[in-house]
């Protein structure tokens, strides 16, 4: 079982006298920066010119270029998309790191897969809240917190663990609990969850269910409701209390169908396929493929995205959601 740390375990905050640079001011960046500042940390924000720069200035932060922020800081937290981090790190962060500095991440992908290679004289750790930035900020303001993971990759100073816990405490995570892990474990489990269950697995299951009903002659609108729209109701129940809560809350007919039909859909062959997915994450096959795809301009990514967006379930869903303004997305989907 994971070791969990709480506020009582952070007896001395070793970062309170240090300057922290938050690189990026998106979902996680704004939450980390504001929570740390509210807890008395000296925070600057490092960005390239754009809307985020203006937003960070409006929120009262001193904003610098990434290179300037990294040079000023003792602690550099990189909160940029995975695929952008290596270039920004090499060009703007690495040249400005000093011995004893801390290089911090919220996801271990680039360090674990050798896309970012820190110098041996800096501490390297991650602090990863298990929730989106708006929730990290909102719960903090309300006096609560989102749990987080932390891991130490490199301890150059002998106090990297203390620094990681101090950072986690600064964003409020120790109120809920901070679980100790490794860069390897955090990276591989995160990627597996996305691919086999949360994104890849769920979308494939939803489409397969929809197609099965439509191919059998049922109206696509009903197939959409039964296989996609109502998924939120079930996921919310699981989110609140696990599978047990979901099964308690649905009808007995639905629960019996769960017991007798679920294992026939997700079979031992499915688990074997999951094993293959995990193996490709572990041996770097997935990472190499994604890095190559990004460097090539993402031709397959964009082509697949365009094709998926025109699947019948999407066409039907757009029409049905016009009947339900209460489910309109907060952010309009578009080209990444």
UniProtKB/Swiss-Prot annotation:
**Cysteine disulfide partners in this protein:** none
| Alphabetical keyword list | Amino-acid biosynthesis, Branched-chain amino acid biosynthesis, Magnesium, Metal-binding, NADP, Oxidoreductase
High-level lineage: Bacteria, Bacillati, Bacillota, Bacilli, Bacillales
The protein, known as: Ketol-acid reductoisomerase (NADP(+)) 1
Which enzyme class?
Answer: oxidoreductase
Residues reported to bind NADP(+): 25-28, 48, 52, 82-85, 133
For this protein, the Enzyme Commission number is 1.1.1.86
Q: Does the keyword Amino-acid biosynthesis apply?
A: yes
Q: Where does substrate bind?
A: 251
Its GO CC terms are:
cytosol
Q: Which Pfam families match?
A: KARI_C, KARI_N
**Domain KARI C-terminal knotted: where?**
182-327
């Amino acid at each position: 079982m994971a070791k969990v740390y709480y506020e009582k375990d952070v007896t001395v905050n070793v970062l309170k006298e240090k300057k922290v640079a938050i690189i990026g001011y998106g979902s996680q960046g704004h939450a980390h920066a504001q929570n740390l500042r509210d807890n008395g940390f000296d925070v600057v924000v490092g960005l390239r010119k754009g809307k985020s720069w203006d937003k960070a200035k409006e929120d009262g932060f001193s904003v610098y270029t990434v290179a300037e922020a990294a040079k000023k800081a003792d602690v550099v937290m990189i909160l940029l998309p995975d695929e952008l981090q290596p270039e920004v790190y090499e060009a703007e962060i690495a040249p400005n790191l000093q011995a004893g500095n801390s290089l911090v991440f919220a996801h271990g992908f680039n360090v674990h897969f050798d896309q970012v290679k820190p110098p041996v004289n800096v501490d390297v750790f991650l602090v990863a809240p298990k929730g989106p930035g708006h929730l990290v900020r909102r719960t903090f303001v309300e006096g609560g917190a989102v749990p987080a993971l932390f891991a130490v990759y490199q301890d150059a100073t002998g106090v990297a663990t203390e620094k990681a816990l101090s950072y986690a405490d600064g964003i409020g995570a120790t109120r809920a609990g901070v679980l100790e892990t490794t860069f390897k474990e955090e990276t591989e489990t995160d990627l597996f969850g996305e691919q086999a269950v949360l994104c890849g697995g769920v979308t494939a299951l939803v489409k397969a269910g929809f197609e099965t009903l439509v191919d059998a002659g049922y109206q696509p609108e009903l197939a959409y409701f039964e296989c996609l729209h109502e998924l939120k109701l079930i996921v919310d129940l699981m989110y609140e209390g696990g599978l047990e809560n979901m099964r308690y809350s649905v009808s007995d007919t639905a629960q019996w169908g769960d017991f007798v039909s679920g294992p026939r859909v997700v079979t031992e062959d499915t688990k074997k396929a999951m094993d293959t997915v995990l193996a490709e994450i572990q041996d770097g096959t997935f990472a190499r493929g994604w890095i190559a795809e990004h460097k090539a301009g993402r031709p397959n990514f964009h082509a697949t995205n365009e094709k998926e967006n025109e699947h019948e379930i999407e066409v039907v869903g757009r029409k049905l959601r016009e009947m339900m303004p209460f489910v309109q997305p907060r952010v309009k989907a578009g080209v990444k």
